[in-house]
Amino acid sequence: MIAISYSSSANLGPGYDILSMGHDAFYDEVEVLEDHSNGIRISGDGIPLDYKKNTAGLSASMILNDYGIKTGIKINIKKGIPAGLGLGSSGASAAAAVRAINKLFNLGMSHDEMVHYSMHGEIAACGSAHPDNVSSGIYGGITLVQSKNPVKIKKLKINLNFSILLVIPELFMENKTMYARSLVPSKITMDEHIESTQRLSSLISGLITGDRDLVSYGMNDNIVERARIKMFPYYYDLKRRVIENNAISACISGAGPTVLILYDDKSDYNGILRSVDDVMRSYNIKYILKKSRIMEAYND
């Protein structure tokens, strides 16, 4: 049984561990086969082959245990989403594996149940079970984590037309996601909480109602992005320059270093491209650009 899962951008500014946007920039393909040997076998290039250290394998192990499935399985993973760039690579493998296992064994899991198993696979990648990326890998579109325990996910109905431009720097850091999560402050002030809530509610409202100005205002973060800025020193300059060219907004994609830019027909697209190049050259950082669109839904 084969399933695919697309890349995603978590957080979208103020929505740390809450919001995620699935997009069609890249995808992983996962094939799950029954295997008469015991246990879980993993195959694929450039990935952990120990199932306990692999997000797809860890998710699969939980399902087999919880559903009392005695047969072994083989998981073949074709990685299309580059790892370590804030594009939901680890979560995509887990989500695709869960969807494939659900179909293979006809388990009839709900979307939220699939998110539950997928998010626990993330422990293999960063040490914590966070549901944001995997929720868009199961539902598609832009998702909101209503509750983590029990898992409750809401898919937002988007009424704003925009395109996506990903600025993907060639920056790689060992254990980057784990380090990025360690930078998030454990305590914030009431003023910081109020501002963050204002931004998040504005962003969600703007996406649902199609209010461009609300999205532009809302896609700004005063807590997590600020705490992580030393990882991405180019970010504020890049964001300022693309907004000067009437981009809707920009944010760090997940744990970075990729920057997600939203633009529309009011934006100066060529001006955005020039601005990106100017800023990244000034920081002596090589990068690639990837145009994308929202991956709305999966057919399973």
Swiss-Prot record:
Query: Can you name the source organism?
Result: Picrophilus torridus (strain ATCC 700027 / DSM 9790 / JCM 10055 / NBRC 100828 / KAW 2/3)
Give the Enzyme Commission number: 2.7.1.39
Q: Which HAMAP family match?
A: Homoser_kinase
- The residues that the entry says bind ATP are P82, A83, G84, L85, G86, L87, G88, S89, S90, G91, A92
Q: What is this protein called?
A: Homoserine kinase
Q: Which InterPro entries match?
A: GHMP_kinase_C_dom, GHMP_kinase_C_sf, GHMP_kinase_N_dom, GHMP_knse_ATP-bd_CS, Homoserine_kinase, Ribosomal_Su5_D2-typ_SF, Ribsml_uS5_D2-typ_fold_subgr
Question: Where is this protein localized, as stated in its record?
Answer: Cytoplasm
Major subcellular site: cytoplasm
The upper taxonomy is:
Archaea, Methanobacteriati, Thermoplasmatota, Thermoplasmata, Thermoplasmatales
